[in-house]
From Swiss-Prot:
Its main location: membrane. Residues 24-132 are cytoplasmic. GO terms for cellular component: cell periphery; plasma membrane. Coiled coil: none annotated. It is a single-pass membrane protein. Residues 1-23 form the signal peptide. Keywords: Cell membrane, Membrane, Signal, Transmembrane, Transmembrane helix. This is Uncharacterized membrane protein YFL051C.
Length: 160
């Protein structure tokens, strides 16, 4: 009686594992048509906060409880490089835009409050407006970026 019981137990464990494996792979299948590039959402983040991003809950889901600033889609170049450009030549492009204009178009227009980007003004606790993050006009110094999509690895002319 112990052998049939062992066989039954082993079979039960196998079926349970197979069911769990099938359920976990089915849950991750895409539901929409495939599109090139990633979708990127931007959420508020407190400027100067150097601890919240270390919390697993924040990185896992809590960031989405903050204000969503906007989104872009179809992004295929996912490199992020940003640093406040600090120059001493007083031209339009060397001024940090500190206030976003409602029409969001002319960064050197009269509706902006600007501050010269000299070394003394390159404070990490100052929000500099820029469109350096995937063309989205925001403050790269205090924003959380969420990227979603599927990566199809390309090798030459073949996709894997």
């Amino acid at each position: 009686m112990s052998i049939p019981h062992s066989v039954f137990s082993a079979l039960l464990v196998f079926v349970a594992l197979a069911t769990t494996t099938l359920a976990s792979t089915e849950a991750c299948l895409p539901t929409n048509k495939r599109e090139d590039g990633m979708n990127i959402n931007f959420y508020e983040y407190t400027i100067g906060d150097q601890t919240t991003y270390l919390e697993p809950e924040y990185m896992g889901y809590e960031y989405s409880n903050t204000k969503k600033l906007g989104s872009v889609s179809g992004q295929t170049n996912l490199s992020i490089y940003y640093s406040p450009p600090c120059e001493s030549t007083p031209t339009c492009v060397t001024y940090a835009v500190l206030k976003r204009d409602e029409d969001g178009y002319d960064p050197c227009g009269p509706l902006y409050e600007t501050k010269k980007r000299d070394t003394e003004y390159c404070d990490p606790n100052t929000a500099y407006w820029s469109s350096d993050l995937f063309g989205f006009y925001t403050t790269p110094t205090n924003v959380t970026v969420e990227m979603t999509g599927y990566l199809i690895w390309s090798m030459g002319n073949r996709r894997r």
